[in-house]
Amino acid sequence: MQLYNSLTHKREEFYTNEPGKVALYTCGPTVYHFAHIGNLRSYIMEDVLEKFLRYSGYDVKRVMNITDVGHLSSDADEGEDKMLKGAKRENKSVMDIAKFYTDAFFADCQKLNIKRPDVVEPATNCIPEFIAMVEGLIEKGFAYVAGGNVYFDTSKLEEYHVFNKHEEEDLMVGVREGVEEDTNKRNKNDFVLWFTKSKFEDQALKWDSPWGVGYPGWHIECSAISIKHLGEYMDIHCGGIDNAFPHHTNEIAQSEAFLGHKWCNFWFHVLHLNDSTGKMSKSKGEFLTVDLLERKGYDPIVYRMFCLQSHYRRNLVFTFEGLDNAVVTYNKLIAKIAALKESDEPIDEEAANALRAKFKEALDNDLNTSLAMTALYDVLKYKTTDHTKLQVLGEFDYVLSLNLLSAAAKKREELKKAQVKAGEFTVVAEGCEPDAAVEALIRARNDAKKAKNFAEADRIRDELKAQGIEIIDVAGGAKWKRV
Protein backbone atom coordinates (compact mmCIF):
# COMPACT_ATOMS: atom_id res chain seq x y z
CA MET A 1 0.00 0.00 0.00
CA GLN A 2 1.29 3.44 -0.96
CA LEU A 3 0.23 6.19 1.46
CA TYR A 4 1.06 9.89 1.40
CA ASN A 5 2.99 10.84 4.53
CA SER A 6 2.54 14.49 5.54
CA LEU A 7 5.71 14.21 7.62
CA THR A 8 7.94 13.53 4.61
CA HIS A 9 5.74 15.25 2.00
CA LYS A 10 5.74 12.18 -0.26
CA ARG A 11 4.04 8.86 -0.87
CA GLU A 12 5.68 5.92 0.87
CA GLU A 13 5.20 2.18 1.03
CA PHE A 14 3.17 1.59 4.19
CA TYR A 15 4.92 -0.29 6.97
CA THR A 16 4.21 -0.98 10.63
CA ASN A 17 6.31 -1.16 13.75
CA GLU A 18 4.92 -4.60 14.56
CA PRO A 19 4.19 -6.98 11.66
CA GLY A 20 0.47 -7.33 10.95
CA LYS A 21 -0.61 -4.78 13.55
CA VAL A 22 -1.51 -1.10 13.15
CA ALA A 23 -1.50 1.41 16.00
CA LEU A 24 -3.71 4.24 14.74
CA TYR A 25 -4.61 7.47 16.51
CA THR A 26 -7.28 10.00 15.57
CA CYS A 27 -7.61 13.53 16.89
CA GLY A 28 -11.16 13.58 18.21
CA PRO A 29 -13.60 16.49 18.39
CA THR A 30 -13.61 19.41 20.79
CA VAL A 31 -17.11 18.87 22.13
CA TYR A 32 -18.37 22.42 22.56
CA HIS A 33 -20.71 22.42 19.54
CA PHE A 34 -22.07 20.15 16.82
CA ALA A 35 -19.58 18.83 14.28
CA HIS A 36 -19.99 20.42 10.87
CA ILE A 37 -19.86 18.32 7.73
CA GLY A 38 -16.33 19.57 6.99
CA ASN A 39 -15.14 18.06 10.28
CA LEU A 40 -16.98 14.86 9.42
CA ARG A 41 -15.30 14.55 6.02
CA SER A 42 -12.05 13.85 7.87
CA TYR A 43 -13.65 11.18 10.03
CA ILE A 44 -15.27 9.54 6.98
CA MET A 45 -11.91 9.24 5.22
CA GLU A 46 -10.18 8.01 8.38
CA ASP A 47 -12.95 5.42 8.72
CA VAL A 48 -12.27 4.17 5.19
CA LEU A 49 -8.55 3.99 6.01
CA GLU A 50 -9.16 1.91 9.13
CA LYS A 51 -11.62 -0.43 7.39
CA PHE A 52 -9.34 -0.90 4.39
CA LEU A 53 -6.44 -1.80 6.67
CA ARG A 54 -8.66 -4.40 8.33
CA TYR A 55 -9.87 -5.61 4.91
CA SER A 56 -6.21 -6.01 3.95
CA GLY A 57 -5.61 -8.28 6.93
CA TYR A 58 -4.16 -5.92 9.54
CA ASP A 59 -5.09 -6.06 13.20
CA VAL A 60 -5.94 -2.40 13.86
CA LYS A 61 -6.21 -0.69 17.22
CA ARG A 62 -7.65 2.79 16.84
CA VAL A 63 -7.67 5.35 19.64
CA MET A 64 -9.49 8.69 19.70
CA ASN A 65 -9.44 11.45 22.28
CA ILE A 66 -12.36 13.68 23.21
CA THR A 67 -11.19 17.23 23.93
CA ASP A 68 -13.33 18.44 26.81
CA VAL A 69 -10.79 20.89 28.28
CA GLY A 70 -7.85 23.04 27.19
CA HIS A 71 -8.60 23.80 23.50
CA LEU A 72 -8.40 27.58 23.19
CA SER A 73 -10.14 29.58 20.49
CA SER A 74 -6.88 30.52 18.74
CA ASP A 75 -5.88 26.84 18.32
CA ALA A 76 -2.64 27.98 20.00
CA ASP A 77 -2.30 29.36 23.55
CA GLU A 78 -4.54 32.43 23.43
CA GLY A 79 -8.24 33.16 23.50
CA GLU A 80 -11.01 31.52 25.47
CA ASP A 81 -11.35 27.81 26.22
CA LYS A 82 -13.82 26.51 23.63
CA MET A 83 -15.58 24.35 26.24
CA LEU A 84 -16.13 27.34 28.53
CA LYS A 85 -17.33 29.34 25.54
CA GLY A 86 -19.92 26.65 24.75
CA ALA A 87 -21.06 26.44 28.36
CA LYS A 88 -21.59 30.20 28.53
CA ARG A 89 -23.47 30.18 25.23
CA GLU A 90 -25.97 27.60 26.46
CA ASN A 91 -25.94 28.47 30.17
CA LYS A 92 -24.92 24.93 31.13
CA SER A 93 -21.99 23.36 32.92
CA VAL A 94 -18.90 22.41 30.94
CA MET A 95 -19.44 18.71 31.66
CA ASP A 96 -23.09 18.90 30.55
CA ILE A 97 -21.95 20.52 27.31
CA ALA A 98 -19.24 17.89 26.85
CA LYS A 99 -21.63 14.96 27.30
CA PHE A 100 -24.30 16.43 25.04
CA TYR A 101 -21.97 17.17 22.14
CA THR A 102 -19.99 13.94 22.55
CA ASP A 103 -23.26 12.01 22.20
CA ALA A 104 -24.25 14.22 19.25
CA PHE A 105 -20.91 13.56 17.53
CA PHE A 106 -21.23 9.80 17.78
CA ALA A 107 -24.88 9.98 16.66
CA ASP A 108 -23.67 11.75 13.51
CA CYS A 109 -20.94 9.14 13.08
CA GLN A 110 -23.49 6.34 13.30
CA LYS A 111 -25.63 7.96 10.60
CA LEU A 112 -22.55 8.20 8.38
CA ASN A 113 -21.47 4.59 9.09
CA ILE A 114 -18.28 5.79 10.80
CA LYS A 115 -17.07 3.01 13.10
CA ARG A 116 -16.55 3.94 16.73
CA PRO A 117 -12.84 3.68 17.61
CA ASP A 118 -11.68 0.83 19.83
CA VAL A 119 -10.75 3.33 22.56
CA VAL A 120 -12.42 6.70 23.14
CA GLU A 121 -10.77 8.68 25.93
CA PRO A 122 -11.98 12.08 27.22
CA ALA A 123 -9.11 14.38 28.16
CA THR A 124 -10.55 14.95 31.64
CA ASN A 125 -9.99 11.23 32.38
CA CYS A 126 -6.23 11.55 31.94
CA ILE A 127 -5.05 14.44 34.12
CA PRO A 128 -2.48 12.24 35.99
CA GLU A 129 -0.96 11.16 32.65
CA PHE A 130 -0.72 14.79 31.47
CA ILE A 131 0.99 15.89 34.69
CA ALA A 132 3.45 12.97 34.53
CA MET A 133 4.39 13.83 30.94
CA VAL A 134 4.89 17.51 31.78
CA GLU A 135 7.07 16.54 34.75
CA GLY A 136 9.13 14.31 32.45
CA LEU A 137 9.65 17.13 29.95
CA ILE A 138 10.83 19.47 32.72
CA GLU A 139 13.25 16.82 34.01
CA LYS A 140 14.67 16.31 30.51
CA GLY A 141 15.20 20.06 30.06
CA PHE A 142 12.54 20.56 27.38
CA ALA A 143 10.10 22.61 29.49
CA TYR A 144 10.20 25.57 31.87
CA VAL A 145 7.90 27.38 34.29
CA ALA A 146 7.15 31.07 33.68
CA GLY A 147 4.33 33.26 34.94
CA GLY A 148 2.82 30.25 36.68
CA ASN A 149 2.49 28.25 33.45
CA VAL A 150 4.62 25.42 32.08
CA TYR A 151 5.94 25.92 28.54
CA PHE A 152 7.64 23.65 26.03
CA ASP A 153 10.97 25.12 24.93
CA THR A 154 11.10 24.80 21.14
CA SER A 155 14.67 26.16 21.01
CA LYS A 156 15.86 22.81 22.40
CA LEU A 157 14.78 21.05 19.20
CA GLU A 158 16.90 20.60 16.10
CA GLU A 159 13.77 20.56 13.90
CA TYR A 160 10.37 22.17 14.34
CA HIS A 161 7.42 22.83 12.01
CA VAL A 162 8.12 19.73 9.99
CA PHE A 163 4.73 19.77 8.24
CA ASN A 164 4.78 23.20 6.66
CA LYS A 165 8.54 23.82 6.26
CA HIS A 166 8.21 27.43 7.44
CA GLU A 167 11.33 29.40 8.13
CA GLU A 168 11.58 30.57 11.72
CA GLU A 169 11.13 34.26 10.90
CA ASP A 170 7.99 33.57 8.84
CA LEU A 171 6.06 31.93 11.65
CA MET A 172 3.16 33.79 13.19
CA VAL A 173 2.79 34.38 16.90
CA GLY A 174 -0.91 33.46 16.80
CA VAL A 175 -2.75 31.17 14.45
CA ARG A 176 -5.88 33.32 14.20
CA GLU A 177 -6.39 37.03 14.07
CA GLY A 178 -6.99 38.94 17.27
CA VAL A 179 -4.67 36.97 19.58
CA GLU A 180 -2.01 38.55 21.73
CA GLU A 181 1.59 37.49 22.21
CA ASP A 182 2.37 35.68 25.46
CA THR A 183 5.28 37.58 27.02
CA ASN A 184 6.07 34.67 29.36
CA LYS A 185 7.43 32.64 26.45
CA ARG A 186 11.19 32.49 25.93
CA ASN A 187 10.66 31.87 22.23
CA LYS A 188 7.66 33.00 20.23
CA ASN A 189 6.83 29.43 19.14
CA ASP A 190 6.96 27.90 22.61
CA PHE A 191 3.61 26.50 23.72
CA VAL A 192 1.81 25.84 26.98
CA LEU A 193 1.84 22.38 28.52
CA TRP A 194 -0.01 23.38 31.70
CA PHE A 195 -2.00 26.54 32.49
CA THR A 196 -2.48 27.94 36.00
CA LYS A 197 -4.59 30.76 37.40
CA SER A 198 -2.18 33.32 35.94
CA LYS A 199 -4.33 32.89 32.84
CA PHE A 200 -8.09 32.56 32.52
CA GLU A 201 -9.14 32.76 36.15
CA ASP A 202 -12.73 31.91 35.16
CA GLN A 203 -11.71 28.48 33.83
CA ALA A 204 -14.39 26.04 35.01
CA LEU A 205 -12.27 22.89 35.17
CA LYS A 206 -9.11 22.96 37.33
CA TRP A 207 -6.88 20.35 38.96
CA ASP A 208 -4.05 20.34 41.49
CA SER A 209 -0.59 20.05 39.99
CA PRO A 210 3.04 20.59 41.09
CA TRP A 211 2.80 24.06 39.50
CA GLY A 212 -0.46 25.11 41.11
CA VAL A 213 -4.14 24.63 40.39
CA GLY A 214 -4.71 24.64 36.64
CA TYR A 215 -5.50 22.63 33.55
CA PRO A 216 -3.65 21.02 30.62
CA GLY A 217 -2.77 22.62 27.31
CA TRP A 218 -4.48 21.17 24.26
CA HIS A 219 -1.43 19.63 22.62
CA ILE A 220 -0.34 17.51 25.61
CA GLU A 221 -3.67 15.67 25.56
CA CYS A 222 -3.21 13.75 22.32
CA SER A 223 0.40 12.84 23.06
CA ALA A 224 -0.31 11.45 26.53
CA ILE A 225 -3.52 9.65 25.52
CA SER A 226 -1.91 7.97 22.52
CA ILE A 227 1.12 6.85 24.56
CA LYS A 228 -1.20 5.54 27.28
CA HIS A 229 -3.17 3.31 24.90
CA LEU A 230 -0.82 2.62 21.97
CA GLY A 231 2.59 2.68 23.61
CA GLU A 232 5.72 4.55 22.57
CA TYR A 233 5.53 3.72 18.86
CA MET A 234 2.64 4.66 16.61
CA ASP A 235 2.01 3.73 12.98
CA ILE A 236 -0.51 6.34 11.78
CA HIS A 237 -1.74 9.61 13.26
CA CYS A 238 -4.87 11.02 11.57
CA GLY A 239 -6.48 14.43 11.53
CA GLY A 240 -7.77 17.28 9.41
CA ILE A 241 -5.21 19.48 7.67
CA ASP A 242 -6.16 22.29 10.09
CA ASN A 243 -4.39 20.37 12.84
CA ALA A 244 -1.02 20.04 11.08
CA PHE A 245 0.12 23.33 12.60
CA PRO A 246 0.31 24.07 15.44
CA HIS A 247 -1.34 21.02 16.99
CA HIS A 248 0.41 18.09 15.30
CA THR A 249 3.69 19.98 15.06
CA ASN A 250 3.61 20.47 18.82
CA GLU A 251 2.56 16.88 19.43
CA ILE A 252 5.65 15.65 17.61
CA ALA A 253 7.90 18.08 19.48
CA GLN A 254 6.76 17.12 22.97
CA SER A 255 6.29 13.38 22.28
CA GLU A 256 9.72 12.81 20.76
CA ALA A 257 11.38 14.99 23.42
CA PHE A 258 9.65 12.92 26.11
CA LEU A 259 10.28 9.51 24.53
CA GLY A 260 13.74 10.15 23.11
CA HIS A 261 12.98 8.55 19.74
CA LYS A 262 10.78 8.84 16.65
CA TRP A 263 7.15 8.59 17.69
CA CYS A 264 4.91 8.11 14.64
CA ASN A 265 5.69 6.78 11.16
CA PHE A 266 2.83 8.16 9.05
CA TRP A 267 0.75 11.33 9.31
CA PHE A 268 -2.57 11.21 7.43
CA HIS A 269 -4.21 14.59 6.82
CA VAL A 270 -7.56 15.15 5.09
CA LEU A 271 -7.91 18.45 3.24
CA HIS A 272 -10.65 21.05 3.66
CA LEU A 273 -14.29 20.90 2.72
CA ASN A 274 -14.98 24.33 1.23
CA ASP A 275 -18.22 26.15 0.58
CA SER A 276 -18.75 29.04 -1.82
CA THR A 277 -17.03 31.43 0.62
CA GLY A 278 -14.01 29.28 1.39
CA LYS A 279 -13.10 26.85 4.19
CA MET A 280 -16.04 25.63 6.24
CA SER A 281 -15.60 26.37 9.97
CA LYS A 282 -17.57 26.98 13.14
CA SER A 283 -15.84 30.30 13.72
CA LYS A 284 -17.78 31.73 10.78
CA GLY A 285 -21.08 31.41 12.65
CA GLU A 286 -23.69 29.23 10.94
CA PHE A 287 -22.45 25.93 9.55
CA LEU A 288 -23.78 22.78 7.92
CA THR A 289 -24.53 19.77 10.10
CA VAL A 290 -25.82 16.25 9.48
CA ASP A 291 -29.07 17.28 11.15
CA LEU A 292 -29.49 20.13 8.67
CA LEU A 293 -28.92 17.76 5.73
CA GLU A 294 -31.57 15.42 7.12
CA ARG A 295 -34.04 18.27 7.58
CA LYS A 296 -33.50 19.13 3.92
CA GLY A 297 -34.38 15.55 3.00
CA TYR A 298 -30.92 14.07 2.38
CA ASP A 299 -29.83 10.63 3.58
CA PRO A 300 -26.50 11.12 5.42
CA ILE A 301 -25.09 8.14 3.51
CA VAL A 302 -25.35 10.21 0.33
CA TYR A 303 -23.01 12.76 1.93
CA ARG A 304 -20.59 9.92 2.66
CA MET A 305 -20.74 8.95 -1.01
CA PHE A 306 -20.22 12.60 -1.99
CA CYS A 307 -16.98 12.56 0.02
CA LEU A 308 -15.79 9.23 -1.39
CA GLN A 309 -16.08 10.53 -4.95
CA SER A 310 -13.11 12.83 -4.27
CA HIS A 311 -9.57 12.08 -3.10
CA TYR A 312 -8.87 12.94 0.52
CA ARG A 313 -5.85 15.08 -0.42
CA ARG A 314 -7.93 17.42 -2.57
CA ASN A 315 -9.98 20.30 -1.26
CA LEU A 316 -13.63 19.41 -1.85
CA VAL A 317 -16.19 22.10 -2.68
CA PHE A 318 -19.60 21.47 -1.16
CA THR A 319 -22.75 22.64 -2.94
CA PHE A 320 -26.28 21.35 -2.68
CA GLU A 321 -26.22 20.87 -6.45
CA GLY A 322 -23.26 18.56 -5.99
CA LEU A 323 -25.09 16.69 -3.25
CA ASP A 324 -28.16 16.38 -5.50
CA ASN A 325 -25.94 14.80 -8.15
CA ALA A 326 -24.68 12.35 -5.53
CA VAL A 327 -28.31 11.45 -4.74
CA VAL A 328 -28.96 10.62 -8.40
CA THR A 329 -25.74 8.60 -8.65
CA TYR A 330 -26.51 6.69 -5.45
CA ASN A 331 -30.08 5.87 -6.49
CA LYS A 332 -28.93 4.62 -9.90
CA LEU A 333 -26.30 2.44 -8.24
CA ILE A 334 -28.82 0.96 -5.81
CA ALA A 335 -31.30 0.30 -8.67
CA LYS A 336 -28.64 -1.64 -10.56
CA ILE A 337 -27.75 -3.71 -7.49
CA ALA A 338 -31.45 -4.33 -6.73
CA ALA A 339 -31.80 -5.87 -10.19
CA LEU A 340 -29.26 -8.58 -9.33
CA LYS A 341 -30.76 -11.95 -8.37
CA GLU A 342 -29.53 -13.94 -5.37
CA SER A 343 -29.03 -17.69 -5.85
CA ASP A 344 -27.35 -20.72 -4.29
CA GLU A 345 -24.91 -21.24 -7.13
CA PRO A 346 -21.18 -21.36 -6.30
CA ILE A 347 -19.16 -18.17 -6.31
CA ASP A 348 -17.14 -17.62 -9.49
CA GLU A 349 -13.84 -17.29 -7.63
CA GLU A 350 -11.82 -16.40 -10.72
CA ALA A 351 -14.09 -13.45 -11.45
CA ALA A 352 -14.33 -12.48 -7.78
CA ASN A 353 -10.55 -12.43 -7.38
CA ALA A 354 -10.12 -10.29 -10.50
CA LEU A 355 -12.63 -7.77 -9.14
CA ARG A 356 -11.09 -7.84 -5.66
CA ALA A 357 -7.67 -7.12 -7.13
CA LYS A 358 -8.97 -4.03 -8.92
CA PHE A 359 -10.66 -2.70 -5.77
CA LYS A 360 -7.56 -3.27 -3.65
CA GLU A 361 -5.36 -1.70 -6.31
CA ALA A 362 -7.47 1.48 -6.11
CA LEU A 363 -7.21 1.82 -2.35
CA ASP A 364 -3.58 0.72 -2.25
CA ASN A 365 -3.01 3.80 -4.42
CA ASP A 366 -3.01 6.33 -1.55
CA LEU A 367 -6.57 5.44 -0.55
CA ASN A 368 -8.05 6.47 -3.89
CA THR A 369 -11.74 6.23 -3.03
CA SER A 370 -12.75 7.70 -6.38
CA LEU A 371 -11.17 4.73 -8.17
CA ALA A 372 -12.72 2.40 -5.58
CA MET A 373 -16.15 3.78 -6.49
CA THR A 374 -15.38 3.02 -10.14
CA ALA A 375 -14.56 -0.54 -9.08
CA LEU A 376 -18.18 -0.92 -7.90
CA TYR A 377 -19.42 -0.27 -11.44
CA ASP A 378 -16.81 -2.68 -12.79
CA VAL A 379 -18.46 -5.37 -10.68
CA LEU A 380 -21.88 -4.63 -12.16
CA LYS A 381 -20.54 -4.75 -15.74
CA TYR A 382 -18.38 -7.87 -15.27
CA LYS A 383 -19.45 -11.05 -17.09
CA THR A 384 -20.15 -13.28 -14.11
CA THR A 385 -23.08 -14.49 -12.04
CA ASP A 386 -25.31 -12.15 -10.05
CA HIS A 387 -24.52 -14.21 -6.96
CA THR A 388 -20.81 -13.51 -7.41
CA LYS A 389 -21.46 -9.81 -7.95
CA LEU A 390 -23.51 -9.56 -4.77
CA GLN A 391 -20.82 -11.37 -2.78
CA VAL A 392 -18.08 -9.04 -4.01
CA LEU A 393 -20.18 -5.89 -3.57
CA GLY A 394 -20.82 -6.90 0.04
CA GLU A 395 -17.08 -7.28 0.66
CA PHE A 396 -16.33 -3.89 -0.87
CA ASP A 397 -19.10 -2.24 1.11
CA TYR A 398 -17.42 -3.31 4.35
CA VAL A 399 -14.81 -0.68 3.46
CA LEU A 400 -16.97 1.93 1.70
CA SER A 401 -19.95 1.49 4.07
CA LEU A 402 -22.64 2.83 1.73
CA ASN A 403 -25.38 0.37 2.75
CA LEU A 404 -25.32 -1.06 -0.78
CA LEU A 405 -26.91 -4.44 -0.10
CA SER A 406 -29.42 -3.32 2.53
CA ALA A 407 -30.56 -0.39 0.38
CA ALA A 408 -30.88 -2.71 -2.63
CA ALA A 409 -32.92 -5.21 -0.59
CA LYS A 410 -35.22 -2.38 0.49
CA LYS A 411 -35.59 -1.32 -3.15
CA ARG A 412 -36.56 -4.86 -4.15
CA GLU A 413 -39.24 -4.96 -1.46
CA GLU A 414 -40.63 -1.66 -2.66
CA LEU A 415 -40.83 -3.02 -6.21
CA LYS A 416 -42.56 -6.20 -5.05
CA LYS A 417 -45.15 -4.24 -3.11
CA ALA A 418 -45.78 -2.05 -6.14
CA GLN A 419 -46.34 -5.12 -8.31
CA VAL A 420 -48.94 -6.78 -6.11
CA LYS A 421 -51.26 -3.80 -5.71
CA ALA A 422 -54.69 -5.10 -6.66
CA GLY A 423 -56.04 -4.06 -10.06
CA GLU A 424 -52.91 -2.20 -11.08
CA PHE A 425 -50.74 -2.86 -14.09
CA THR A 426 -47.20 -2.21 -12.88
CA VAL A 427 -44.28 -1.51 -15.19
CA VAL A 428 -40.83 -2.03 -13.66
CA ALA A 429 -37.47 -1.14 -15.19
CA GLU A 430 -35.00 -3.95 -14.42
CA GLY A 431 -31.36 -2.97 -14.07
CA CYS A 432 -31.83 0.44 -15.65
CA GLU A 433 -33.42 3.79 -15.03
CA PRO A 434 -37.22 4.18 -15.56
CA ASP A 435 -38.20 5.69 -18.92
CA ALA A 436 -41.61 7.33 -19.30
CA ALA A 437 -41.76 6.81 -23.09
CA VAL A 438 -40.97 3.10 -22.81
CA GLU A 439 -43.50 2.69 -19.99
CA ALA A 440 -46.20 4.40 -22.10
CA LEU A 441 -45.62 1.95 -24.98
CA ILE A 442 -45.74 -1.06 -22.65
CA ARG A 443 -49.03 0.17 -21.17
CA ALA A 444 -50.40 0.72 -24.70
CA ARG A 445 -49.42 -2.86 -25.54
CA ASN A 446 -51.25 -4.10 -22.44
CA ASP A 447 -54.36 -2.12 -23.44
CA ALA A 448 -54.20 -3.66 -26.93
CA LYS A 449 -53.96 -7.16 -25.45
CA LYS A 450 -56.95 -6.52 -23.19
CA ALA A 451 -58.90 -5.34 -26.28
CA LYS A 452 -57.77 -8.55 -28.07
CA ASN A 453 -55.96 -6.41 -30.65
CA PHE A 454 -53.03 -8.80 -30.76
CA ALA A 455 -51.64 -7.43 -34.00
CA GLU A 456 -51.18 -4.00 -32.36
CA ALA A 457 -49.71 -5.63 -29.26
CA ASP A 458 -47.17 -7.49 -31.41
CA ARG A 459 -46.35 -4.31 -33.35
CA ILE A 460 -45.53 -2.44 -30.13
CA ARG A 461 -43.44 -5.36 -28.88
CA ASP A 462 -41.46 -5.38 -32.13
CA GLU A 463 -41.00 -1.60 -31.98
CA LEU A 464 -39.54 -1.88 -28.48
CA LYS A 465 -37.38 -4.83 -29.50
CA ALA A 466 -35.93 -2.72 -32.31
CA GLN A 467 -34.93 -0.20 -29.64
CA GLY A 468 -33.06 -2.90 -27.73
CA ILE A 469 -35.80 -3.35 -25.12
CA GLU A 470 -37.03 -6.75 -23.95
CA ILE A 471 -40.45 -7.07 -22.27
CA ILE A 472 -41.07 -9.76 -19.64
CA ASP A 473 -44.74 -10.29 -18.76
CA VAL A 474 -45.34 -10.99 -15.06
CA ALA A 475 -48.40 -11.26 -12.84
CA GLY A 476 -50.00 -7.84 -12.52
CA GLY A 477 -47.68 -6.08 -14.95
CA ALA A 478 -44.50 -6.25 -16.96
CA LYS A 479 -40.77 -5.83 -16.49
CA TRP A 480 -38.46 -4.46 -19.13
CA LYS A 481 -34.75 -4.25 -19.61
CA ARG A 482 -32.26 -3.06 -22.18
CA VAL A 483 -30.43 -5.87 -23.98
Give each language-model segment a name.
Residues 59-61, 141-147, 383, 470-472:
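Short, well-structured beta-strand/strand-turn elements
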Residues 63-69, 98-105, 115-130, 148-157:
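Short, glycine/charge-rich beta-strand/loop segments that flank catalytic centers
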Residues 57, 92-95, 106-132, 142, ...:
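Non-catalytic interaction-recognition regions
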Residues 8-11, 17-113, 473-480:
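N-terminal, positively charged nucleic-acid-binding surface of large information/translation enzymes
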Residues 1-32, 47, 106-107, 127-341:
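Alpha-helical recognition segments enriched in aromatics with Gly/Pro capping
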